[in-house]
Amino acid sequence: MSTSAIIYSGYNMCKFYDGTKLLSLQDLNGQRPEIYICTTNRTGGKTTFFGKLCVKKFLNNGEKFCLLYRYNYELDGIADKFFKDIGRLFFPKYNMTSERRASGIFHELYIVENGCDNKVSCGYAITLNSADQIKKYSHLFSDVQRIMFDEFQSESCHYCPDEIKKFISVHTSIARGAGEQIRYVPVYMLSN
């Protein structure tokens, strides 16, 4: 994983936050960063922009995504939690479902066109607290192209023990495979 990160507090007068500028920036060495940190006020539109980006990249290019959380209980109702707003706003022809995998260690996300029975896997939802188990299932995540970590800053300072080590472990587990020892898998870290 690249050690560089781009931090940008984006605000514009559009209806929704636009992270296009953030994603176009390079680090001090002129390289494309692997970690993008985006902070704005609550309801600034960060989650909407990056969630829409993940789904749009899947629908247009088949690029799967990963939603990253801290604790397993946060995966309950994940499809509705992630897709309810962006689905209504940007993807009204689609619905999202999820299925627990590996005894609930992670969830596989599926996108379904309304009126169709054919669900298509579009990504995964995993947790930092399951970093050791995720490592054992890393081969399943070799098709992930991007990671979205919403609310990476806890308002109550409730973090996982060794959270940074777990974050690096999860990213490494996802960024290997697909014929590569290490792949470029950007992480969008969003918070207030």
Please describe what each predicted stretch is:
Residues S2-N192:
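Phosphate/NTP-binding elements of NTP-utilizing enzymes
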